[in-house]
Regions:
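Glycine-biased, small-residue-rich flexible motifs in mid-sequence functional cores and linkers
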Residues: 1-174
Length: 174
């Protein structure tokens, strides 16, 4: 089980990494489960790349099962029901409140053997997930980026501070 997380403002670089990594991982480890949070950005691209490569994928939601947030990800969520599923600790009617996202990240990190941070600014939920993964003694990886890119600051710091191993491909991950 791996989780792929990152910024909600994914760049083409991050989107392409998700697509290429999961395409290659599907060949090397066809039974791997991909977990993320169904959010904008890296999360949704990870789910969609998993589906495109026939990998099971699970979204951990920050609200009840009676809604999909963001609503524009409803089709992907429905597709995931046949190839993974949706998971939440929140009761029906629970709203996607800010504190629920941090709680959701705890489950994402806890159910995964490895966390992969694809892109992250200096602050964000994906860095919280990486910190939680470290606390759970899980493997953590980060995709390096250009030092001038805001969306790479968090990943580069994780690597620099030895909080995550540098990852460039599925082959070296396996």
């Amino acid at each position: 089980v791996i989780d792929m997380v990152g910024t909600r403002r994914a760049t083409d670089y991050g989107k392409q990494f998700c697509a290429d990594f999961l395409r290659d991982l599907a060949v090397l480890c066809p039974d791997v489960l991909v977990v993320s949070g169904l959010a904008y950005g890296i999360d949704i691209h990870a789910h969609q790349a998993a589906l495109a490569n026939h990998l099971p994928t699970v979204a951990v939601l920050a609200h009840g099962l009676d809604r999909i947030y963001p609503y524009v990800h409803r089709k992907t969520a429905i597709d995931m029901l046949a190839q993974g599923g949706l998971l939440t600790e929140f009761l029906t009617g629970a709203n996607p409140d800010k504190h629920n996202f941090v709680s959701r990240n705890r489950i994402v990190a806890g159910m995964s053997d490895a966390t992969i941070v694809v892109e992250s600014a200096a602050k964000g939920g994906s860095l919280i997930t990486a910190e939680l993964a470290e606390g759970y003694h899980r493997d953590c990886f980060a995709v390096p980026g250009r030092v001038t890119d805001e969306s790479s600051i968090g990943c580069n710091r994780l690597i620099r501070d030895n909080k995550a191993a540098l990852i460039q491909s599925a082959e070296e991950f396996v």
